[in-house]
Amino acid sequence: MNTQDILQWLQQVQHPAQGDKNLVELGMVHDIDIKDGAICVTLAFPKRPDPLKNYLVGAAQAALYRNAPGGTEVEVKTIVKDPAKPSPKGIQFNLEQLREVSHIVGIASGKGGVGKSTVTVNLAVALARLGYRVGVADADVYGPSIPTMTGTEGVTIEMLGEDENDNLFVPVEKYGVKWLSVGHVSGAGQALIWRGPMASTALKQIILQTAWGPLDFLLIDMPPGTGDIHISLIGDVPMSGAVIVTTPQAVALSDVLRGANMFRNPQVQKPIFGLVENMSWFTPAAHPEEKYYLFGKDGGAQMARNLDIPFLGQIPLVQDIREGADEGTPVALQDRPDGQAFLELASKLAAAV
């Protein structure tokens, strides 16, 4: 629990008379003191009376109790002082920590449930096995799964810096990859109930306030879908381009078009390095020579041709991949055929950027 955590929690409190602006954006957080398992926050109110003062104090206390570890003492004080000048964008970010990153690649999907995070994790491990320096930012703020898939749940994230203005997250290193997830920061199993502006701020912190160091690839596991969070992320992070993950199923393929259009939007204009078809066929462990096309056949390849984007490959639906994700041991670590599929995918991506 640190100052950055508390600032994030206080972003959950909006001033009803100030639209969607929260306490942090309004410059109302005057001081934060953390000592001996207790939190004391001081809010600054203007000289003119604010009829919502008691409400905001109570809402701030509730946000702190809701998010802080059990048993934490919480106190919210107030002072009469004109709040600091509000920032139009809330917490300010810069690109300094990305200066030594060669390629930033967003891993996207038009819808959830297509295995985007599984592909991200195994693609990262495969790139590392090919000798590249790799990092992964899990920006899926609503369902971060990378801590589970990498066996890094419960890891304590270290911080660099003397105060909240220059604190940096230190990513977890495992399997030759640097990992940082919203799930690492928020804690295992903690519900993330954030509105759009708060979600955008959280994922930007994960990407822009992390000491990544020199990297050949930084993969960003983006939230599924296409919306304001995605546009905000793409606008603020200098992505080299994107990879879109789908299944051969018609329902998933219909969402690929929306994802492609998002990156091709005139306000975005990011290259699409290719499309990955996940769950292309099912092969029973006892019958490795058999293929069952449960979701249709070659739909991803056809969609890639229709959109005139590279087709990076097909990943089967097999027990080893699922078990590796559940156990935190990515299948790309192995030289079996399914692991080899991710190595081939990594080689094609490296050639495409």
Description of each model-found segment:
Residues 3, 26, 45, 58-62, ...:
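C-terminal lobe/tail of nucleotide-utilizing enzymes
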Residues 10, 29, 101, 112, ...:
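Residue-level signature of catalytic and energy-coupling elements of molecular machines
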Residues 25-28, 33-37, 45-108:
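Extreme N-terminal, non-catalytic leader segments
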Residues 127-194, 200, 207:
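Phosphate-binding loop that captures ATP/GTP phosphates
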Residues 183-233, 253:
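Phosphate-binding/switch loop-helix module in NTP-utilizing enzymes
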